[in-house]
Curated annotation (Swiss-Prot):
Its main location: cytoplasm. Serine protease inhibitor. Strongly inhibits elastase and trypsin stoichiometrically at the molar ratio of 1:1. Acts as a moderate inhibitor of plasmin and chymotrypsin. Does not inhibit thrombin, urokinase, kallikrein, tissue plasminogen activator, cathepsin G or the cysteine proteases papain, cathepsin B or cathepsin L. GO terms for molecular function: serine-type endopeptidase inhibitor activity. Keywords: Cytoplasmic vesicle, Glycoprotein, Protease inhibitor, Secreted, Serine protease inhibitor, Signal. It comes from the Eukaryota. The keyword Amino-acid biosynthesis does not apply. Belongs to the serpin family. It holds the Pfam family Serpin. It is found in: Cytoplasmic vesicle, Secretory vesicle, Chromaffin granule; Secreted. It comes from Bos taurus (Bovine). Glycans are attached at residues 100, 180, 230, 264, 318. Homodimer. This is Serpin A3-3. PROSITE patterns: SERPIN.
Amino acid sequence: MRAERLSPLLALGLLVAGIRSVHCLPENVVVKDRHRRVDGHTLASSNTDFAFSLYKQLALKNPNKNVMFSPLSVSMALAFLSLGARGPTLTEILEGLKFNLTEIQETQIHQGFQHLLQALNRPRNQLQLSVGNAMFVQEELKLLDKFIEDARVLYSSEAFPTNFRDPEAAKSLINDYVKNKTQGKIEELFKDLSPRTELVLVNYVYFKAQWKTRFDPKHTEQAEFHVSDNKTVEVPMMTLDLETPYFRDEELGCTLVELTYTSNDSALFILPDKGKMQDLEAKLTPEMLTRWRNSLQPRRIHELYLPKFSIKSNYELNDTLSQMGIKKIFTDADLSGITGTADLVVSQVVHGAALDVDEEGTEGAAATGIGIERTFLRIIVRVNRPFLIAVVLKDTQSIIFLGKVTNPSEA
């Protein structure tokens, strides 16, 4: 029997152009506060805050559509860029990432991402997870030695000389790299490149895991999914009887079900009551997520209905990030920490993601029965209307994937 699996694949690219070529546009980090431990957990709260802020912007710009992205990928790419930012540009990036610079220093932020990368890329028996960064640099562009070293040590970044004056060849080089790193799931991160491009920073994430309690493909049947009041589509609906963390939030009008993987990481499915999606989206905060996670209790769900879906997304984030307060990188940036001169601006930020829930993969382990509280109430959860999903890595509490499924039948 094959196990149902969840496979998010993600990539983000930051495209940096040189003002001088455009003419039309003008191993360890030493931190001062040695008593404060800086690791992946240090970033969790800020990253979650950034995740929900970005989600709200994308949902606003894409009403009644599927929304899929990796908060981790976007925040890591911007933090990577901030290595070369100076002055107000640096402050704007870090504050846009929801860091309180009166409480945490820049060096601590980079060290936190360094530890997070190391934690994410540790070998795992039950999980395929790969996270990384890369720089594609115009052949004659001279980068500062410190930037190259910091990029390598803190963000494990590879660097590739690239001829952007031949934009088609450069595009193929970058897209092929991302395609390879995401196991072929993201084929075209960049649809076009300008010959004036000087530098492209790329972050990618590949994640594949099997459910701890498997779905039986023989029980998957076509069923109705209510996209809206006046639109219904037929989708393959999986079904399962299991014991798993569950919470019914009467205050916000939603039902939460957490499904765990064999790696003990998890996917949190948030199903708003009919007509409650916008109210719920408006109230998404790190505090709300903490309340939900603390309220989840093991319950027997007699019938869980969950749609299969395969969704790809591609976003250009320039306007979105500007509305979130990260503006200077696109106009009057000071990225002098990259080359030593302030003549670079970011011309394009693109993000691609693909999320598959399907029947491939190996058999999952049996569900544990530790501390299960049985109830005589028969719980039935039908995920047959738009819902939210958050994939959370247990050891770092990082939201690696966040999205809204409005229509599972749309790729």
